Swiss-Prot record:
This is Nucleoid-associated protein PMT_0025. Keywords: Cytoplasm, DNA-binding. The lineage of its organism: Bacteria, Bacillati, Cyanobacteriota, Cyanophyceae, Synechococcales. GO terms for molecular function: DNA binding. It is found in: Cytoplasm, Nucleoid. One of its GO terms (cellular component) is bacterial nucleoid. Coiled coil: none annotated. Homodimer. It comes from the Bacteria.
Amino acid sequence: MAGFGLPNFGQLTEAFRKAQQIQQNAQKLQEELDAMEIEGSSPDGRASIWLSGNQQPLRVRIEPSLLAEGQDASETAILAALQSAYEHSTTTMKEQMEELTGGLNLNLPGMSE
């Protein structure tokens, strides 16, 4: 049936094999990302937030000296730490996905720059 523009059986089998391998690797990657702890800190280092590689919040640390400066300073530092952690985890996730897919351009939602 190659005359109808269909791939031959060998090509189809190889495509399925590759898809299964990617699926297995994706499951492993999911577990690795879940186990990661990625830290983001405020510029002065007095607020830190840790996210998993899948961007799940894990913990927060705020130095007492920051809290003593009041609500506005604390909120600003916490937001900066969260943004830093999110940026690091997004970069890590993107790099891991690119490694998993072997550089295939899959245009995954939320993973483009």
